[in-house]
Swiss-Prot record:
InterPro entries to which the protein is assigned, alphabetical: Leu-rich_rpt (IPR001611), LRR-containing (IPR052394), LRR_dom_sf (IPR032675)
Keyword terms, alphabetized: Leucine-rich repeat, Repeat
Keyword Protease in annotation: no
Coiled-coil zones: none
Region described as Disordered: spans on this chain: 24-46
Pfam families in alphabetical order: LRR_6 (PF13516)
LRR repeat residue numbers: 106-129, 134-157, 162-185, 192-213, 220-241, 248-269, 276-297, 304-325, 334-356
Highest taxon of the lineage: Eukaryota
Annotated protein name in UniProt: Leucine-rich repeat-containing protein 74B
Record organism: Homo sapiens
């Protein structure tokens, strides 16, 4: 045993019976268990409720046998932990089915990390059944699992039933416009979901037209990441209009899409009306100087935005100047970080930056290859925009 503990004779006898049952289910004959199996086994758990954990382990092993999969020893060790990390374990759909039967009755796990397990739609459907019944799990990472539209549909339906979920990560799952309809339904129905990560998918302009109205009506989400998708054209504009009407979202990452000048103009209009958003990342969105000027119209009046990242956009020094001039013209601006990384600026911009710092001494302006420090803590989605030396 990994740690010493004292139990009554009755508890020890019950534990021994449970251990033998586990051995049978895992294919190990009782005769081969040996007395030491009770003391040094991968199935053993620690704590005063060890017997209950063994019962749950037995259920998991029975399910593994039924689905012809090898049990995951780290799950048996972490079964009573609040955070269950099973990323990169190669579970597949069958492994997900075996796991789901145990999770549905597990009262301990609050955060579940199943990133990169090849779950596919079938595995997501199995887990959705467990999530619809769990009252304890509120944070799930299912990124990089090839979930597709079938997986998205199952998960969104499950979360609509169970309002316990607070954070869901679905990055890198090949989600396209068909999945956007189910995601939109989730945004409309789930009022307690606070954080949603849809980055690195294939959400296109049609998806933007679907998600935009849902974002406008959503009444709970505070952090949304849709970076590295294909939002452009009318879809980007529709999405931005959803932001304009939303009154809950505080953090939005739309970097590495194709908003372009029309999308930037729509975001500018949104910033005129939105008095809640605090952090916005629009890096690499094909925004020219003209789009930057349109975006700046929102900065002239907005009083809540603290962080704006527009790095790697072809807006040149003229666009950067226009944005900064808009900030200068807004004495009520709350901006603390304005990031123009990888955009070269001229002396005229530098002069304006000096003047703005006199008005807003707390404002950090980042340009070109210049290394500056922004000392206040950022949410994880924005930390990549800062130099490695900046405290996280």
């Amino acid at each position: 045993m990994r740690g010493s503990c004292e139990r009554s004779g009755e508890d020890e006898e019950q534990k021994e019976e449970a251990m033998v049952a586990c051995g049978r289910l895992s294919g190990v004959p009782e005769a081969e268990q040996g007395p030491e199996a009770n003391w040094d086994s991968d199935l053993e758990t620690e704590g005063t409720d060890g017997l209950g954990e063994l019962v749950r382990d037995t259920l998991y092993l029975r399910s593994c046998r039924a689905h012809s999969v090898v049990p995951i020893s780290c799950f048996l060790r972490q079964g009573s932990a609040q955070e269950l990390n099973l990323r990169h374990r190669g579970l597949g759909p069958q492994g997900a089915r075996a796991l789901a039967s145990s999770l549905s009755s597990n009262p301990y796990v609050k955060r579940l990390d199943l990133r990169d397990n090849g779950l596919c739609g079938a595995g997501a459907e199995a887990l959705a059944g467990a999530l619809s019944k769990s009252s304890s799990i509120h944070d799930v990472d299912l990124s990089e699992n090839q979930l597709g539209v079938a997986g998205a549909q199952a998960l969104c339906a499950a979360l609509t039933v169970n309002q316990a979920m607070r954070k869901m990560q679905l990055s890198g799952n090949g989600l396209e416009e068909q999945a956007a309809q189910h995601l939109a339904e989730l945004l409309l129905a789930h009022t307690d979901l606070k954080s949603l990560d849809l980055s690195y998918n294939q959400l296109n302009d049609q998806a933007g037209e679907t998600l935009g109205p849902a974002l406008a009506e959503n009444t709970g989400l505070t952090e949304l990441n849709v970076s590295w998708n294909h939002l452009r054209g009318p879809g980007a504009v529709a999405f931005a209009r959803g932001l304009e009407a939303n009154i809950f979202l505080k953090v939005l990452d739309i970097s590495y899409n194709g908003f372009g000048d029309p999308g930037a103009s729509a975001v500018g209009e949104a910033l005129k009306a939105n008095n809640v958003l605090e952090e916005l990342n629009m890096s690499n969105n094909r925004i020219s100087a003209m789009g930057a000027l349109s975006l700046g119209l929102g900065l002239r009046v907005n009083q809540t935005l603290r962080i704006l990242v527009v790095s790697r956009n072809p807006m040149r020094s003229e666009g950067c100047f226009g944005l900064l001039k808009s900030v200068q013209d807004n004495p009520a601006s709350a901006l603390e970080l304005l990031d123009f990384s990888d955009i070269q600026v001229n002396a005229e911009f530098d002069g304006l930056a000096s003047s703005v710092r006199g008005i807003l001494p707390e404002l950090c302006i980042k340009t070109g290859a210049c290394r500056v420090e922004y000392k206040k803590e950022l949410l994880p989605v924005f930390r990549s925009a800062l130099p490695a030396s900046v405290p996280k």
